A protein has these predicted regions:
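Conserved catalytic palm subdomain of right-hand nucleotidyl-transferase polymerases, strongest
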Residues: 37, 139, 269-283, 421-428
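A residue-level signal for conserved active-site and pocket-lining positions in enzyme catalytic cores
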Residues: 38, 100, 140, 187, ...
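Residues immediately flanking
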Residues: 39-41, 103-104, 141, 279, ...
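C-terminal, non-catalytic extensions of nucleic-acid polymerases
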Residues: 199-267, 295-297, 324-498, 502, ...
């Protein structure tokens, strides 16, 4: 039975339909209401061990004035009936009704067999951004917000998200308590609250962008348009865009993301008194003060040194011979290089007989700092361009956001503009590095296909874009400059650096003089931009509510770690205090002063599991946080069990099934799905590549025998020397 509710009261279908007819519509025939959709599902294996998934409740939320209407049911036939009701009441066809779904890709796998799709738009398979079905449009609210539902509710102050016990096997025939139904309705209520705010902010629902970076693009374009002639600005941008497939492909292959790596000589060791430095707003900082390449031209590959000395921006395809890391830091990524006989450090190259890669002049500078090269490299392709600052109004659009984010933080009554500035400045990077040439993603009868775009046609379309205001090479250089800033500082500190990630460094010893000199250089560069473009100092040096100057792009000092241990990129744990194993009260509640960051594992799940196991084995969680630990057992390795990991393995199925099933209460009913997703909780373990494992064993033997030392000021402890950070 389909149920209709107004807030918490059950109403008739007739009363709901009356409200549908009263919904305002824009001149472009879009209904101006916030509407959301969600389903709850159960996964199980049948008696033959086959994977199954079934929907046991679906729900819509619909906002009218200050009221929220809900519709929910238990079967797909009921859902199809409601879709027909919506089509009829809203007279869909030329008129459009937008319904938001958080993580549309999941719901899409269930609903595509229950309705005819007229259009599907996706950037990659299984991740539709929106789908259309004769006037009914489903959009993904996750792509728009870039938040999980729980974080969206917390950040925006919406209704708090509650969790059902998903381990319970529920079917469409399972009686649901009022509390369980309430949990289901909260999810769609959060999205309706969010979309109501977005409609208010944008004016109409059709003006809401598809993704979070769409807001950043719109903001920057509007800012530029309000300060200069946009046609003249865009003409200058079009003049410098890559105009040949060779140049574009060279740029695309030279693009590299953030640098994250652990010093192999510190990997697996509990370090004490670790200093933490953060490079504030890394990407906006380099965009506002660094110079970027403008129009590229092809150049003589034998003249690389000449162009470097002239201070030109350079793109190149280059081969290095006999390349070998000078220190414990390996910076070149194996997957970005073609190599012969490489020695690898967790995906980073220590040495190679021959190495071919596509890089910028900034990468070339860093490579020469961190590697020795046996003989002169061979440059195969070379393009050069002049370095200039980004256009003033593009810089100012970013600085305005930084100023707002800094000055409005914690100001009572300014929470909304602060959050908007924060979200926009966080999207500036994504906006700048978006690849303008996208493959076409097709969906046919349950199968996703990728059709590569024609580069020549794509570049022509890119050049003619009405909303163009950045050049693709600028995005390539944004990450190149950010890596250069990070690695240049790492190079100066040396082997005291334990770990670095994008815009942060964890190191032994304070190295105050190095960070101070880096900050002096950065402030000098900021001043040069201010003088060049006549920019007021307050934009680079805004003040917080406490009247403290917060200069853009400086290295800031974060609280010191009392203990820190890394097992490689995106794998580390730490505590701020000696007595981390004693629960203490903080603003976040009562908890242990022990924290964990592991890619693919929730911080809360990983921490709770380690604490639980440390109590079981009566050892420190720092000891448990390892690939293997023979002190506990000969085959122990850190593993978070399925019930604690919060991770699931998802499989997508397009084969229909119909079978008898039994729920957790013993109720039997026939379940039927034409397409579905099966999700199964899985354990999480700290795996390690055999090559990396052998490397670490070699390093540890060298440390234990005194063969390797970080530098003249640092003596690494011998492995097993002392039981650091043990529970007392």
């Amino acid at each position: 039975m389909v149920t209709y509710k107004l807030n918490n009261e059950i109403i008739s279908e007739h009363d709901f339909c009356l409200k549908c007819r009263q919904t305002p519509i824009s001149g472009k025939n879009y209904y101006q209401c916030a509407m959301s959709f969600d389903i709850e599902t159960t996964s199980y294996r049948n008696n033959h061990g086959e994977k199954r998934g079934t929907m046991y409740i679906w729900q819509f939320a619909f906002s009218y004035d200050n009221d929220i209407y809900y519709i929910y049911g238990r079967t797909w036939k009921e859902w199809e009936y409601v879709i027909r009701v919506l089509r009829y009441q809203f007279e869909l066809g030329k008129k459009k009704l937008i319904i938001y779904v958080h993580n549309l890709g999941f719901e899409f796998q269930w609903i595509y067999t229950h309705m005819y799709m007229t259009k599907i738009f996706a950037r990659k398979p299984r991740h539709p951004i929106y789908i259309e079905s004769n006037g009914l449009i489903f959009r993904c609210s996750y792509f728009l917000s870039n938040y999980s539902l729980r974080n969206l509710a917390r950040e925006r102050g919406y209704t708090s998200k509650e969790e059902l016990d998903y381990s319970i096997k529920r079917l469409w025939c399972t009686p649901l308590t009022d509390e369980e139904i309430s949990y289901c309705l909260v999810d769609v209520k959060i999205i309706v609250e969010y979309i109501k705010d977005e409609i208010k902010k944008n004016g109409t629902i059709e003006d809401i962008p598809l993704t979070s970076t769409g807001y950043a693009r719109r903001y920057c374009l509007e800012y530029i348009s309000s300060h200069e002639n946009i046609q003249s600005y865009q003409a200058k941008i079009r003049d410098i865009l890559p105009d040949t497939p060779e140049l574009f492909n060279l740029m695309n292959e030279a693009y590299t993301g953030a640098f994250t790596h652990a010093n192999r000589n510190h990997t697996g060791i509990v370090e004490e008194n670790v200093y933490c430095k953060d490079y504030t707003s890394s990407y906006p900082a380099v965009m506002t003060r660094k110079r970027f390449p403008y129009r590229f031209r092809k150049a003589d590959p034998t003249k690389l040194s000449t162009y470097i000395l002239r201070g030109k921006a350079v793109l190149m395809k280059i081969t290095f011979y006999g390349i070998n890391a000078k220190s414990n830091h390996s910076i070149l990524s194996l997957h970005k290089c073609a190599t012969e006989n490489p020695k690898v450090d967790n995906g980073r190259i220590i040495s190679a007989d021959e190495l071919t890669t596509n890089i910028t002049d900034l990468d070339y500078d860093i490579i020469n700092k961190f590697y020795s090269i046996k003989r002169k490299p061979k440059v195969h392709i070379l393009y050069v361009a002049d370095y200039r600052y980004l256009p003033k109004n593009l810089i100012m659009s970013i600085l305005e956001l930084y100023k707002m984010k800094t000055t409005l933080k914690d100001v009572i009554g300014k929470e909304e503009p602060y959050l908007r500035a924060k979200e926009l400045i966080n999207s500036v990077y994504g906006m700048s590095v978006t690849n303008p040439l996208n493959d076409e993603i097709m969906f046919n009868y349950g199968e996703w296909d990728t059709i590569p775009t024609d580069t020549t046609e794509g570049l022509e379309k890119y050049r003619k874009g009405r909303k163009i205001f950045t050049a693709y090479q600028w995005g390539v250089w944004v990450t190149a400059w950010a890596r250069w800033e990070l690695l240049n500082t790492v190079y100066r500190i040396g082997n005291d650096v334990i770990y670095c990630d994008t815009d942060s460094i964890k190191c032994l010893n304070e190295h105050k003089e190095i960070f101070d000199s880096e900050n002096e250089r950065i402030m000098k560069e900021n001043k040069e931009v201010m003088e060049y473009y006549d920019i007021d100092e307050e934009f680079f040096n805004p003040k917080t509510i406490e009247n403290k100057v917060k200069t853009l792009g400086l290295w800031d000092t974060e609280p010191m770690y009392r203990y820190f241990k890394t097992l490689g990129a995106k794998r580390y744990c730490f505590s701020y205090e000696d007595d981390y194993f004693i629960k203490k009260q903080s603003k976040l509640g009562t908890d242990y002063n022990f924290f964990i960051t592991v890619a693919g594992l929730s911080k809360e799940s990983g921490k709770n599991s380690l604490i639980k196991q440390s109590l079981k084995y009566n050892v420190s969680p720092f000891d448990l946080f390892d690939f293997e630990n023979t002190n506990i057992s000969n085959n122990y390795c850190m593993e978070v069990p399925p019930e604690d990991s919060g991770k699931s393995a998802f499989s997508y199925h397009s084969t229909a099934f119909k079978e008898l099933a039994v729920d957790y209460l013993g109720n039997k009913c026939t379940v039927e799905e034409s397409s579905f997703v099966h999700a199964e909780p899985i354990a999480f373990s700290l795996s390690i590549a055999e090559q990396y494992k052998l490397l670490l064993k070699t390093v540890r033997v060298d440390i234990a025998t005194g063969g390797i030392c970080s530098n003249k000021n640092t003596k690494l402890r011998k492995v097993g020397d002392k039981n650091w950070a043990k529970r007392s």
